[in-house]
Amino acid sequence: MEMDTLVKDHLHSQAKINATPCDEMGIEQLIATFSESEEAYLQKTAKFLIEWFSPQEFLSLHTSGTTGTPKQITVRKEHMIHSAMLTGAFLQLQAGDRALCVLPTDYIAGKMMLVRALVLGLSLELFPPSGTPFAATSDNFDFVALTPMQAMKSLGELHRAKKIILGGAPISAAMEAQLQEIPTEIYATYGMTETVSHIALRPIAPKARHSRIYTTIGKSRVWQDSKGCLVIDCPEVAEEEIHTHDVVRLHGAHAFEWLGRLDNIINSGGVKI
């Protein structure tokens, strides 16, 4: 297959998906196997892998509505690669770390788990998106991304992951208190499709590190508009300033507290309510 040069240059030699090495032959094998599967989540993964390794510079993504009405946008593969590298550096992920993906790979959160595996050299296990993500496997993992809803239904299993990032919906105070008791590094993320996943994180657990303040990653800077909403400049993952409907309290140019939505819209498991 003809691979995008940038993508090929950033394909880590230790990357694996479902135990298959992600060299050129392995990628072709994964695409063929997943395309022929009756499982919709594998078919969607095959579609993304085809798009990712194609010569096209951009990918089309659907936004969730954080910055306004949900719409289709195009993002640079280069920005997705940068995002993966920033997350890897912040969380100190290592090549060979085991990762679990139980998020839909037709949306940015699931797509970025695939990109992180390919770029950082993770060994990624794919399972169907589920409200009980650990039910399908008895294995332990170094890195997992979940929605708060998935985490809430898996409180007794979260110790099986060394590092967990949560995103896609607000985390209630009651849930946050429960999460603090788990012996795992757990982070709340802030981001959106326009920033190809998160641009800031805050620690939830362990309890000693808990904070309400998000810290930006990479070169991202933040400020407020006249309505008190967050504005983001994140040159590594987006070409333009991003104006959100999220009301925040600033703590300098690289930290903020999330106070709520100007339009009172929140996301829950990827569904707007």
Each model region followed by its residue ranges:
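Conserved AMP-binding A3 loop
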Residues: 58-85, 92
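Gly/Ser/Thr-rich phosphate-binding loop
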Residues: 154-207
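Conserved ATP-binding loop and adjacent catalytic segment of the adenylate-forming AMP-binding
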Residues: 184-227, 237-241
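Conserved coil-to-alpha-helix start sites within the AMP-binding
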Residues: 2-23, 102-119
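Conserved pre-ATP/AMP-binding loop-to-beta segment of ANL
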Residues: 44-62, 95-96
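Conserved S/T- and glycine-rich ATP-binding loop of Class I adenylate-forming
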Residues: 63-66, 99, 114, 144, ...
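AMP-binding/adenylate-forming
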Residues: 77-82, 98-153
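Conserved ATP-binding/catalytic segment of the ANL
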Residues: 229-273
